[in-house]
Amino acid sequence: MFPGFRPSDHTDGERALFAAFVAAGLAGAWVTLIVTNRLLGEESLFFEFVSVHGLWNFIAGAIGTVSSIYLNRRWFGHEGLAGLRYAAGAILNTTFVATLIAGTFALPFYGTMFGPLAIVGTFWTSPAVLAIWLFVLAGVNLAYGVYRRERASVFEAKLPSETEVYFRRL
């Protein structure tokens, strides 16, 4: 580890966010490799990236996904029915922005234009990829929920109970 860095120094919400960002980055990198391989005519869900191009697509997918989640962070982690609506919008927007960013890095201009279309085609033909993507982004939503509740608990007012002596009515 790094000197001065211990996982125990961080709160549960921060650790949950870190795990969610790592999982989403890996899932986004994997989906990016699937999409770019399908654009090249290969239909495999599991493969080895042995070229510099494959490695760069992997990195571009991770960067695109993590930065897209960061840009949409205000919509993740809310409670209730409104939180469910926010999460659905965040998942759609995160998917779109991630394809724009990763597509621009992976294949400039071509990837920017056809990235969103290619991801829709990939999700349409491979429901397993869509299910994994939605599962990971639902995990991001849960992690942001833990983080938001943790941050909100810092500012909760501690009201005295009626059993305490100085609170009783005279």
Language model features: what each stretch is:
Residues M1-L170:
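Juxtamembrane/disordered regions of integral membrane proteins
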